[in-house]
Structure formats: structure tokens, C-alpha cells
Amino acid sequence: MGEGTTKENNNAEFNAYHTLTAEEAAEFIGTSLTEGLTQDEFVHRLKTVGENTLGDDTKIDYKAMVLHQVCNAMIMVLLISMIISFAMHDWITGGVISFVIAVNVLIGLVQEYKATKTMNSLKNLSSPNAHVIRNGKSETINSKDVVPGDICLVKVGDTIPADLRLIETKNFDTDESLLTGESLPVSKDANLVFGKEEETSVGDRLNLAFSSSAVVKGRAKGIVIKTALNSEIGKIAKSLQGDSGLISRDPSKSWLQNTWISTKKVTGAFLGTNVGTPLHRKLSKLAVLLFWIAVLFAIIVMASQKFDVDKRVAIYAICVALSMIPSSLVVVLTITMSVGAAVMVSRNVIVRKLDSLEALGAVNDICSDKTGTLTQGKMLARQIWIPRFGTITISNSDDPFNPNEGNVSLIPRFSPYEYSHNEDGDVGILQNFKDRLYEKDLPEDIDMDLFQKWLETATLANIATVFKDDATDCWKAHGDPTEIAIQVFATKMDLPHNALTGEKSTNQSNENDQSSLSQHNEKPGSAQFEHIAEFPFDSTVKRMSSVYYNNHNETYNIYGKGAFESIISCCSSWYGKDGVKITPLTDCDVETIRKNVYSLSNEGLRVLGFASKSFTKDQVNDDQLKNITSNRATAESDLVFLGLIGIYDPPRNETAGAVKKFHQAGINVHMLTGDFVGTAKAIAQEVGILPTNLYHYSQEIVDSMVMTGSQFDGLSEEEVDDLPVLPLVIARCSPQTKVRMIEALHRRKKFCTMTGDGVNDSPSLKMANVGIAMGINGSDVSKEASDIVLSDDNFASILNAVEEGRRMTDNIQKFVLQLLAENVAQALYLIIGLVFRDENGKSVFPLSPVEVLWIIVVTSCFPAMGLGLEKAAPDLMDRPPHDSEVGIFTWEVIIDTFAYGIIMTGSCMASFTGSLYGINSGRLGHDCDGTYNSSCRDVYRSRSAAFATMTWCALILAWEVVDMRRSFFRMHPDTDSPVKEFFRSIWGNQFLFWSIIFGFVSAFPVVYIPVINDKVFLHKPIGAEWGLAIAFTIAFWIGAELYKCGKRRYFKTQRAHNPENDLESNNKRDPFEAYSTSTTIHTEVNIGIKQ
């Protein structure tokens, strides 16, 4: 057992298995290549090494959760108030405060518990099985039970459960894009052994296979060498865990300075002022500010009594302190965000961290991957060039698998290069090529045999299948995306694979169509072509070919396709100038073809070449035929070049519209992709990330707009900061490039989001202000590092998230304004109330502590929730992002808070004094802050009037802040009827409507129910005072409307003096205008790339 432990310790530290042979690796790790581990050894290693996971489920620490909820400055004020109340034996006030604390903490606990469970469920979205050899027998086990030393078997479609030193490989390729970012499969070879002195990167260790990689071809056997956090992917996951960095030492500073800095960081983290999103930090700072204001006001109360503090003075101090704390804010904020997160699920956005949804409202820049996010992740044929025949173009095809969609046109005789350089403009484009083909309505000088030969090759040098699913009535396809694109075009031209080979397809929709290109299946049960042999695509030669026998003309045919350079190297001839005779392929001819390859590539297309050759039965004997069908070099020699196809991954239908809306919202979109420059540039121009026909740009701007990863990484930080514009497109982008891009954005004070799906994207996802992972193709590690997960991997869903984030920010701003204005009103009202002295010279509070809490917690809480549910404003996505540094506390909000607070204070004070001195005798009695006595009648009745006034003013304020500038009676100026508009305004948000109605009605039972009114709320039933309450509530409403009218006049004047701030004119402005050096419009922007 001790020896085993030593081996395991050595294995954990050893990272050079690529330098060992399979036998040496097996001996080092202590396993058998044929028998695998014994059951006893497996049990021991599982106990020693642990399960093969990237970390346990997040443990639910209830104590820590409670502490996290309590460590809030607002809750601290409530706690202190509760303790003082109980110490003074004011059980009612203490009990009410305890209830408020319990509600806040409970709701926070529930939400944090849900977030923890969500994280755990995301970790367990995929838990694949593993196939291993133990005790000489093959077993299927859960991948978490894999341990170092297991012999693992993997095949096509499997996810590799751990890092492996390969023993055997058979045509074995893996997709390591989640780890390395490289999209192309990597061919593995178990027989390779690398030198110990060589510096071999992870991606180049071709005798190893890595955890979480997908097997895309072949099968293999390997020794498990690393599991869990010791695997390559585990190392990335471990780096993401990190530490808080709160306590650190700077060698250049003294011990005292370091202690002070660390104390500030820890205190800030404890109070939430230096961690979290901008809103979280702002609210935490607000809570701290309100805490000290509450303490200050309590001191003022005690000072007014010359610090002669008894029970009544202490209770008054508590009352004033409570008036400054928006006790329901945490509850309302949590519920609003929870509702927003629930809404986003229906819009394909899963919110892992609630605060991140609000943070999206401040996003200035979005950095997105291309494949599968901006694009469909599927391939479409776009252009085909057949020498001496012409260029075929396929357009308006949205469904990559549907051959019945799209328009096919032909430019006769012109090549893509000739067409792009043609200055006459008239090239004789023939629309509806397929219909013309059937009707034989084509120019006589066009040789259809050339098209027939190319299409036959495209169909047969292909193993993909395209069919219509009868159950769903949808077109589907199986095979490689590139081959599917070619097969879809062949099917579009009524020459699918099974039409030539006779393979049965119950789902073939074109079985009744008569092909104009082939007379296949003339005899029942016969097939024109019989498959003889195939040489599959190989990443080394980058081509594939198939050998068929043509039963109709008794010829053997070899059809090949692949990368242009690979195919052209196998060709010795092509069809000559007359398009009929085969002529030798000269260097000049190859250069002509290559120009067309570049022309297609510059349009962002992936280019493949096609070639074929044929010979009769009489031209070869059996030995020669056997050599051709078994020897790739022989079969793929002396081919005849037939043509090119350009295919591409089309943008999603929603992408261009989403990009346009982002630009309209003042958000820049950057494409960071591993694809080639030409492809990235073309897609970016197609969806609007890059300009096309708008303005003329300086060369400096052009060079900055599009870069390769190596160009960007080659710049120093100073050079990046000096760029006139950060790149809108970075091609051949590495994970480190993405991190550098985020750092550059942060240095420019930008608030950015990053999308990603691979493990290698995790550092950039975590560094971005908002990390967005892909739900379908994303790795578990990337989801763990993200704040938001897109369940459909669709770029347009980010628009949904940003819109919801802005809506929430708007609504949070509204209810924060409502709640804080009430706090200001109550605090000013109570401070002014210090002037009311009873017969003993003690201050009489014009509102009791329970009245204060009732208004803050009960009356205001539900309208605030209603404000949180307000629909998005019509111009929401026409505004620029809000300043993340300022957040929701703009100068307008701050001024509004004090303005409404002062108007409300005036209304309530007028109601109290009018009741006390107008309707009643004006007697202030004695000991009226405690138990009721006969001398307190006037005070108790006046409190009721003031309580009703403040309650109703708070409710009216909720309606007023629905729009911060428009009149409550003209919320929707586009409505013709004022009456209809009024009812639309109050009924549009039914939750808000009924919560306000509830608040209005609730004032009556609170005033009239015996015991509750005089024992708890310290007020009495009233009569004529209701008239005062109603009158001064209306006065507040009029005051609020007059204030908003003044605001509208002010901002109208500001727009007149500063038209650039007008939203409507900004919407008409070109999003790239800031980069323009002239106003010459409709100038083609030719963005060149430095080589």
C-alpha cells in the first residue's frame, strides 16, 4: 500500500507522459496494459485520489448564508434599533423591527439557496459514462469513478473522461477546441514519443488525449494519467477558483500601510462596497451612508434633549434612525431581480448571478465569438465555379438543410475573378438557373456536360445524406457540415447521392421528380453507379476520394474533393479553352485557378476543389484495378480539375437586426473569432459589425478595425491604448487575445461582456464585467465562470438580456427614488417635529416608530415591487448605456429624491399642524410617546392625519415616478383620448394598481381597529381630519406635477442648446460616424489586412 501511495504522489507531480512510451507510462503509474487495475487497487486509488470531478457541488453553508444577509449596513441599523427597543422594554417596536429583519433575511436566504442549487445543477448538466478495462474485463462506469491507471476505451462520439496516454490509435481524431481553442480536429498517434529536452505545448502532445475532448473519428485505447483537477482542464478550473486577494502584502509599503490597506479591503468586502456589480456597490455604499446619517440624526435627537436620554428620547432617536433606512429595499430588489431572471428563462437566457442582469444595462461593448453565436454553425453552398461553364450563385437560402429554398443563378462563362474585376457591369446573369435547365432555355454555347461532370463528382465524392423527416415535415441531414452543404446543392439540382447509387431512402422527397441531368434507374432495381472503394478525408492530405463503377457505360470513375492546394497537386489536366477537350494543366492555368480561389476566399468563403478521372474496363487488368482501389497515391494521380465551390457558415437570421439594435443602443460589437481573416471580415460586414458602403476612412482607422490575433498580441499595452479604435474584428484569436481585449476595454473605462463556450474561454469570461456562456455547446467550466448562460447559443438572445437589464435598471431607479424620497420626507418631518414639546418639555414625535415602519415596509413595499414590474420604456434601446460609475444615482435622481421628499414633508407637516391647531385644541399633553392618556388626544388624532397623508403621498409618488419626466396624466402622449390615456396609465401595471389601492384602503383599518391603533401605532380614530389628509395629498400631487413640468421645460431648453443629446437625432446617426474622416457617403470600404 505504501508503494501505491508513492506512485500516486509521483503521478500527481509528473507532467511529462508524452516523453514516455506506453509501456514506460504503464510501469510508472502502476497498471497493466492488458488487464487494467484490480478492484482492490481501484478502491484504494479512488479513496486516495478522489472522484474524477472538477469540484464538489457547492456546499450549502447556512451559517455563512445568514451571516452574509446580516452583514449589511441597513440591517445593522435595524438590529441596533431592535436591541435598543428591547432594552427599553418597548416590546411592540422591537417585535415589529424583528419581523422586518426576519423578512429581509429570509428572502435573501431563499434566493441565495436557489442560486447555489442552480450552480450545482449546471455542474451536473452532463455526466458521461466511461468504458474501462478492469480485471481484464471491459466495464461501463460513471466517469467520476475513473482513476489514474485505468485502461480507457474511446470511440467516435465519446467524450474523453480523463487525460490519457494513448496505447493504440486507429484513425483517431479529437476535438480539443474546448481546451486549446483550435476548431480543427487533432490527429493522434500512440506511437509518437517526444524528447525530454523538447518544449512541447499541450496542443502538440499528439500521443495524449485530454479530458472533455470529443472523439470525432476513429477509436483508441489509453492509460488514464490525470483525473479531476490534475487534468489539463482541471488546471484551468482550479485557476478560476483562485482566492479573494483581500489580504496581500506589497513589499514596497510598510507593515502599517499593508495592514491598513488589507483592513480597508476586508471591511469593504464585508460591507459589499468593493465587490459585486456597480449597483451592488452603489447600494452598499448608500447603506453605509444611511447608517451614519441615521446615527447622526439619532445624536441630533439626543442633543435636542441636552443628552438627557430616557426611554422616550431613546425611542424617538430610534424612530428618526428608522426613518432613514429603506427597510424594504433589499426585499424589493431581490424579488424584482428574481422575477426578471424568471422572465429571461422564456427568452433563452439563464441568469446564474442575479446582479449580472442589472449589470447588462451598463454594457458599452460586447465581445462575441462567431461560429454558432453570430452564425448558424452550419454550412451553405454560396458560389460554384466551373471552368469554361461559368459561376453559379445560390442566394436567399435561410435553411441550410432545405434544398427547396434559395435562388440559383448563373453567370455564363465568367469566373469569380473576372466577374469581380468586370467594369462593364453587364455580365448576362441568368436567373432561375434550375428552371432554365429543365426547360433547356440556356445559351447554346454553354456546355452542360461540364456541369454534369462537376455535379456528379460533388454528389459521389460525398457520404452525407439529406432527407425530409416525414414525422416533423422538416429537412434534416447527417454527416460532415461541409459535405452536407454540397449534398444539399446536389439535391437542389435533383441529383442526390441515392439517385445515382440506388440506395434506398424512404425520406427522399424528390423521388417523383424527373432529373434533367441523369437517366438513372432506367431498369427497375438497377443503379447507375456501384461503390467500389473510398479513401476517407485525412487531415494530412486534406482531401477524400471515392471509386465507383458506372454500369451504364462500363467505366471506372474516381471522384475527389478537398482543399484547393491538395486537389490541384493531384491534377494534371483540365478542360481547355473550348470546354470540350482535356488539355494539360500549365503553371499559368494553375495561377488562373488560384486567382479565383482568392476571389472566393475574399468573400469569406471556404473553398474546395473537385477533380475526377475515368477509364474503361479494357484499360485496366485485375491487378491494376486492385492497385487503384487500395493505393491512394495511384488512385488520386493524374486527375482532371473540374471546378471550385465556396461554402460558408451563414449568419443567423436575427444577427444583423440584433447588431443594428446594439448600435442604436450605443453598444459596440466586437467579433473575436478563431476563423480566418477573410471569413471573419465578410461575416462582420454582412451582419453590420463592420461598415460596408457608408464612409471613407483613414488607413489608420482601417488598420485598427480588423486585426489578426498575432497582430493585436504583438502590440504593447501603450500601443493598444494609442489605437484610434479598438478592433471590431480580431481573427485567428487565441484565449489570451480575448483577455488582452478585455483589459484594453477596461483601461478605456468600458463596461463589457464576453461570450465563450470553451474551457479556454473561462479566464476571459471571468474577467469580463458580465461573462456569457453558451448553454448548448458550452463546457461546464465556462458555465461555472460565467454570469449568464444562453440556452440557445444565439447572439440575439444577448439583446434580450441587455434589454431586460436596462428595463430592470430603469425600474430599480424608479423604486429606489420612491423609497428614498419617502425616507427623506420622514426624516425631515421627524427632525422638524423636534420643535413640538409636551408639557414636560420633551419632544413629541409626530409619527410613531411603528407608523414609520408601516409606511416603509408595508405601504411602500408592494408599490415598489409594482414599479419593478413596469414594462420597458418605448425608447429603452434608443438610449446610450448608463454610466456604470454613476449607476442609478444620477443627479436627476438625487435632486428628485430631495424635491419629492421636501414636498411630501411639507404636506405631512401641514396635515399634522392643521389637525393639531386647526381642528383640535393644540394641546401636546405629556408622555404621549408611550402609553395613551387623556392629555394625548390631540397628538394621537394629529398623528393619524399625518400618517394617512404620508401613506397616501407615498402611494401617489409611486405613480408619479413611473415616468420621471412625463406628467402622470400624459404618460402615453401617442394616445388620442385623455380619458383613455389616464386609465391606460393606471391599469397598465395591474400589480402596481392593486398595491396602491390596497395601500389607500389599509390606512382606514389601521386607524380604526381598537388596541392596534392606540397600543401599537400610537394614534386614534379621526373624523374631520380625513378632509385635511385628502386635501394635502392632492396638494402633494399638484406639487409633484408642477415640479415635473419645470423639469420638462428645463430639459427642453437643454435639448435646444445641445441637439447632439437628442435621442431621436442620435438614432438616425451612423454608428461608425465617430471613425469617419470625411462626410463622403456611399464609398466602399475596402478593409485590407496586413500580412
Swiss-Prot record:
The active site is at D369 (4-aspartylphosphate intermediate). Keywords: ATP-binding, Cell membrane, Ion transport, Magnesium, Membrane, Metal-binding, Nucleotide-binding, Potassium, Potassium transport, Sodium, Sodium transport, Translocase, Transmembrane, Transmembrane helix, Transport. Mg(2+) binds at D369, T371, D757. Residues 1-63, 112-282, 334-815, 870-885, 965-991, 1043-1091 are cytoplasmic. Its EC number is 7.2.2.3. It is an enzyme of class 7 (translocase). GO terms for molecular function: ATP binding; ATP hydrolysis activity; metal ion binding; P-type potassium transmembrane transporter activity; P-type sodium transporter activity. The keyword ATP-binding applies. Residues 503-519 have a biased composition (Polar residues). Present with 688 molecules/cell in log phase SD medium. This is Sodium/potassium exporting P-type ATPase 1. It comes from Saccharomyces cerevisiae (strain ATCC 204508 / S288c) (Baker's yeast). The gene is ENA1.
